[in-house]
């Protein structure tokens, strides 16, 4: 048998004999396992011998970096008295020094920094290269692996596991007594053979810690849970390389111990390695504001984390939105509805919603791809096949419904007789309501949960009706909602009552369609039924919502709107700055035009004005005001009011440019004006997107004498380009154009209160006088108009509020 085995066996027998001679195991000592042997000097025998370390001396109650150690008197003091038989041995262990135990491989062993534990004595005694802690209490015997791996991971004192002390993981050595104050602890360098750790000194008095090798647990930071099982983060080696006075080795955590009920539990938290081992603290102390620096650093880190982890703008209100419209820019557009259907979905998608636009496929669109889905729907007694095409652009799914009824109607999407129009709209609404089930956008259909349909005008007013009659009344799509947007209530889908069977609805739904008015008598009104069935209703401006409640502005639906006023909201449209922005407008990058901003307004806009005059064959003059009109040629837009005021306009030193298409008699009127006043007037019959952009940029004034205008977009485009609007104060025009006040230097343009020629002449006269005589006030009007936030982002936020209301409406 080897000498090492003999020495170990001898030590174990000596420990058992010592325990038996003193009356067996006592409370306050670790029993059943011998302490690691130490080579000590035996004073009586006069030689070195392998002996177990003496029992611990009493330790006062003290606080060291947030860890409370408790030492009791009583039995522990008796054990210390018994341990004082050897004077030299007493000198060895009463000097206040203790040494972290070495591992079997020669490295520094594990140090327990738990509440109530006592630092163990080194395996080879207290001498040698161990660090000495001056002013510390006497050491405790080091437990072996069996003792240290008890179920609570702490040093037990001989009590049963079900006692409060053992459940606490504390070392209980006797009755509790008041703790005595202890001087601050300082630790000298530890020249351990593995990787010694030398923490930098600090100016302010505080205890320092020696971090053992990778096998030992690190002490917990102040205020943290010493029993937390969260591992330490790996330190940044580059940081430690810069600080020559410190070298830290990562250590593994000890098993987590539970607490007994009498002592309140400490909330567990993950250790912040950098915050605890404050290696930059000496530099901060020299600056005198170390706490503030670290507070600022923590604040900046939290801001960065918040930005990195920030969710969608919609927050918890993210939902699936399907916008259904008969037209959508840039594929098919006849008015403002096409702009809304093309821009609003992108703004909603930027807020985090999953958005789809469903529109008929009037032509061959290169972006759209056939998804391979074929469905059959009955419209006006016929079974018609429907195909679905899909394109993903700017975060929005665009789904095009293809059917023979829609093809080759790119230039006349609302044309045909009433039966043809009705058949197209019935087929479109039936196919659109089932799109979330059949079309796998991105491989995943939208489904009918957390879904809101956003229908637009009477062309899609049947969608809320079909959603309720076909699905919700039959227990399907219970969490799907519908919102109907009123862009122009003058078009309602009115027809005879005997057309109701073509819609293929239950008979009792006829009551929702029937309306009576003094002029047309009893009729079926599709828009009226949609307003009743929709969960929410939106108008394109607050002013237009007010007008719809009046007898004149409601166009026969004012009673229905008043009854459903509780679910109606007015939201002003926005503009798409990627298309309507003088700074990046692609139509201003050729033919002598120029892009400009507010800063370059004085140079860019005159260039556009001169280029427009040359392109249209007008005299290039910077001093003459250039007036523009862009719109549909019909009674609503009030172009005939301009015709009645033409004698006065022709007598002024001005230039007039009109662009639009519509009623034939009004188109002829534009051509006649150009022929009569060739040096001042230009009439462009038809619609050109490029010319609309160039007139908006080159004109000084834009006139909009609309008899009614739900919202209007041209006045928004004009103000964004620094063109001053002169409008009839109605609907959305009243909401978006505030009257100019020369005394307060406020306002965005001129307004008149009645759609009459003399009112237009009066407002236009004040405008021209300001242009000629008050250049500073005129430039203020331009700058204020260009400085507004007219984007769709603000409107999308308001639409989102309406969608949320519809979602939680039952």
From Swiss-Prot:
Main EC class the enzyme belongs to: transferase
Compositional bias ranges of the Acidic residues kind: 84-93, 281-310
Cellular compartment(s): Plastid, Amyloplast; Plastid, Chloroplast
Tissue expression notes: Expressed most exclusively in endosperm.
Gene Ontology MF term list: alpha-1,4-glucan glucosyltransferase (ADP-glucose donor) activity; alpha-1,4-glucan glucosyltransferase (UDP-glucose donor) activity
Family: Belongs to the glycosyltransferase 1 family. Bacterial/plant glycogen synthase subfamily.
Protein known as: Soluble starch synthase 2-3, chloroplastic/amyloplastic
Organism (species): Oryza sativa subsp. indica (Rice)
